[in-house]
């Protein structure tokens, strides 16, 4: 009579490759479940949501801060900004934005000291660029791996409830690891690093006819829960994308 493995009823003498096939099948089902499931929904009157914001440069940064100014700092707090390690401009802009947020909250009569402390909290972290302009493809492989390792550390350390990005290539490894964090949540929850971030991507207003490479990657792979575009024509071309007006 064949001996079985616990309550699963699997024979203990099965070849190792069978267990591998079973494990891979379970993982694939889990990935599909996460990719096709609706984004996490949280009540609007719930506790503050840890928010991670990936900043690019130039127009991307300007659009992101326009978007952040429309969001409640009391609801989306604390905020952790992720920038490329060679991007000093975005760090300065983040600090200026947060200084303005702090002043506005301090002047508000309905914000107590505890709420002010939480809503004003922010931090800035860096990750290496996955690829510099003009960099060769072979060298890019190693820099991409390095960026992915740093992105994983950021995501599992900060455990965001919301991940917000709008186009820079820097966001791809961060989004990928946020998706991994959701996929592995049944496991990571037990060791205290689990999170279930809602991943939101906002395409740049500069993209009027087609999505950027980053946008196409996140849209096609379904790594992003919500994809917003700023032109109605783009929403018609990409049916799962949503048009909600322009940021600025």
Per-segment meaning from a language model:
Residues 1-248:
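Nucleotide-activated sugar donor-binding and catalytic core shared by glycosyltransferases
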């Amino acid at each position: 009579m064949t001996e079985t493995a616990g309550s699963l009823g699997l024979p203990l003498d099965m070849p190792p490759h069978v267990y591998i096939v079973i494990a891979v099948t379970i993982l694939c089902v889990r990935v599909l479940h996460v990719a096709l499931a609706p984004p996490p929904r949280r009540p609007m009157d719930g506790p503050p949501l840890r928010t991670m914001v990936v900043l690019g440069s130039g127009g991307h940064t300007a659009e992101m801060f326009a978007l952040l100014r429309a969001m409640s700092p009391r609801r989306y707090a604390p905020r952790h900004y992720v920038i490329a390690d060679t991007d000093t401009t975005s760090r300065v802009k983040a600090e200026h934005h947060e200084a303005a947020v702090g002043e506005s909250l301090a002047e508000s009569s309905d914000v107590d000291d505890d709420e002010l402390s939480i809503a004003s909290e922010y931090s800035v972290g860096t990750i290496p660029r996955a690829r510099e302009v003009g960099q060769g493809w072979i060298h890019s492989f190693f820099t991409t791996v390095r960026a992915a390792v740093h992105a994983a550390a950021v995501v599992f350390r900060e455990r965001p409830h919301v991940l917000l990005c709008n186009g820079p290539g820097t966001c791809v490894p961060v989004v990928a690891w946020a998706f991994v964090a959701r996929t592995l949540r049944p496991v990571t929850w037990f060791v205290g690093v689990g999170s279930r971030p809602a991943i939101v991507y906002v395409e740049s207003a500069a993209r009027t006819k087609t999505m950027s490479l980053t946008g196409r990657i996140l849209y096609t792979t379904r790594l992003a829960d919500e994809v917003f575009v700023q032109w109605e024509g783009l929403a018609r071309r990409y049916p799962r994308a949503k048009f909600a007006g322009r940021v600025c």
